């Protein structure tokens, strides 16, 4: 375990939202170094489907696996053919593009791409209907979640979060 203790990638966690309800996307990202306990846990998620939750590998097209290898786990149980099509189609393409955007933009070093495993947990609204908007939202949210994972979260950033806590907002919260 100490082998990965000071790794700047392994175990980094980020999240992001992009788009508008119901076609937006919420992404959680966990970055892992291949061979680490974190990577083993991510691969365990891929090997552990359960009813309605079907982990898969993000592909840019059929047979074209994204690098860094990206394991995707849906947060919303599947079963409805429309939601399945949007999750495995628009959402998957957006996630694949977002990962590659992070590499293209230098958020992740292309030289490290084969040594990194990314676990993405994706939430797709069951009432999503605009595949183009879903793909765009997943692309933007994935890139942003990866950037959040590798970004600096120093004491100043934490103080800013604390200061903003009373202005918290969520598109699904309708209360006061």
Regions from the PLM with identified roles:
Residues 1-176:
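Accessory interaction regions appended to the cores of large information-processing enzymes
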């Amino acid at each position: 375990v100490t082998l990965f203790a000071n790794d700047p990638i392994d175990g980094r966690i980020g999240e992001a939202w992009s788009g508008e309800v119901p076609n937006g996307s919420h992404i959680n990202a966990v970055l892992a170094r291949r061979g680490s306990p974190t990577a083993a846990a991510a691969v365990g998620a891929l090997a552990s489907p359960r009813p309605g939750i079907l982990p898969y590998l993000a592909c840019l097209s059929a047979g074209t696996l994204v690098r860094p290898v990206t394991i995707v786990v849906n947060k919303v149980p599947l079963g409805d053919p429309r939601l399945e099509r949007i999750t495995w189609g628009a959402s998957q393409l957006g996630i694949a593009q977002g990962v590659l955007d992070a590499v293209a933009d230098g958020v992740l070093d292309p030289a490290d791409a084969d040594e990194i495993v990314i676990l993405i947990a994706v939430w797709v609204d069951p009432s999503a209907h605009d595949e183009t908007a879903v793909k765009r939202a997943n692309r933007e949210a994935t890139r942003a979640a990866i950037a959040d994972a590798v970004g600096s979260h120093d004491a100043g950033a934490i103080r800013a979060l604390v200061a903003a806590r009373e202005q918290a907002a969520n598109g699904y919260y309708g209360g006061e």
